[in-house]
Amino acid sequence: MAGLVNINIEFKELATSFIQRSKAGIVAIILKDTTKMYKELTSEDDIPISLSADNKKYIKYGFVGATDNEKVLRPSKVIISTFTEDGKVEDILEELESVEFNYLCMPEAIEAEKTKIVTWIKKIREEESTEAKAVLANIKADNEAIINFTENVVVDGEEITAEKYTTRVASLIASTPNTQSITYAPLDEVESIVKIDKASADAKVQAGELILRRLSGKIRIARGINSLTTLTAEKGEIFQKIKLVDTKDLISKDIKNIYVEKYLRKCPNTYDNKCLFIVAVQSYLTELAKQELIDSNFTVEIDLEKQKEYLEGKKIAVSKMKENEIKEANTGSNGFYLINLKLVDAMEDINIRVQM
């Protein structure tokens, strides 16, 4: 029972720190340089002097961050991984598989490298249940984990391509708390962009492009959306919003981490303990509802569908079992939970499955 008491404490701490953690994201940058290196930086002062001038500039963009009521918010860390002309982006991606980050970017990526990054992000999100996402330029990925930035900008009189500005965009997103959206967030250093009319801007947004617009005297993010354009019953409009995907990802991460670290390792996987774990998750979500991150009408329960699949795989005649018998059935070391919740500013429910 002590293990479950600790779980409640852990969930309370995670709920309390949710907003703070959401605005202290980690940006990972893949760079091409003359030497191979991997570094984790916490400020511009940590930038290696041996890097090229362009690479130093990309990293500085990664530390610009966001503003909240005139307070500057920055990523908690910028990770850089470089490779030489003899190297391959696949090697860097393999290296990053064991690294925790929120947003990946590659300011000098060619088309083939962008495609490989998209494929890799999709794979690790599916296989590893990671919250990793990427900010790339001019690529129609049609995926909630890929932000497609398509705007060239002028900074200090110099035109900067969308590709080379992805580190700045990643920094903005990673530093914005989940209580806010990046929609209309200003990019104060940008002096000008190519002017387009509202209809053209709306069409770009509908096509899953993250673009900039001049509004109220400043150049701002037009709409905080990712590249997802194909909507399904499982992935509706809320999956197009960067803020909501970030919130969903962090909730999933918190619950799964506590489940693995504090529940599976310390508590027998009995039905009674599963119910106590559900109560702990409910308490965590209640705290998030108080912070207006999710709606208060949520449910947490044993995932009957997945439970049935597990039992059928064990050659158990599920058709002859009552619902309560299925819920209470022994699932070995596996746990199947279904969370239904509504993220604030969304009009539809989402399901989060926790399966271990």
UniProtKB/Swiss-Prot annotation:
InterPro entries for this protein: Phage_sheath_subtilisin (IPR035089), Tail_sheath_C (IPR020287)
Keywords recorded for this protein, A-Z: Host cytoplasm, Viral contractile tail ejection system, Viral genome ejection through host cell envelope, Viral penetration into host cytoplasm, Viral tail protein, Viral tail sheath protein, Virion, Virus entry into host cell
GO biological process: symbiont genome ejection through host cell envelope, contractile tail mechanism
Cellular localization per UniProt: Virion; Host cytoplasm
Subunit relationships: Homomultimer.
Protein family membership: Belongs to the myoviridae tail sheath protein family.
Role noted for this protein: Polymerizes as an extended structure around the baseplate-tail tube complex. During ejection, the sheath shifts to a contracted form, thereby making the inner tail tube protrude through the host cell envelope.
Protein name listed in UniProt: Tail sheath protein
